[in-house]
Amino acid sequence: YPPKPETPGSNASPEDWASYQAAVRHYVNLITRQRYGXXSSPEEAVAWLLFKADPSQDIEPRLDDDNAW
């Protein structure tokens, strides 16, 4: 990951704060950018990101348990 932007001091100018906010936006965009593998479907990528699921496993929810709720 890229380095986090440094927070300006408490007595920083409005221009410094605007520059910091732009740097934070850029940083967040970089670290949250979607990265899919060449053979991955978006569903597999989301399952991996959310659950660290094995892409070889079925990603559909299992509804075979009658006592789920």
UniProtKB/Swiss-Prot annotation:
**Primary location group:** secreted
Q: Does the keyword Secreted apply?
A: yes
Q: Please give the biological process terms from Gene Ontology that the record holds.
A: feeding behavior; neuropeptide signaling pathway
GO terms for molecular function, please? Answer: neuropeptide hormone activity; neuropeptide Y receptor binding
The organism's place on the tree of life at top rank: Eukaryota
| Secreted in keyword set | yes
Q: Which family does it belong to?
A: Belongs to the NPY family.
Name-wise, this protein is: Pancreatic propolypeptide YG
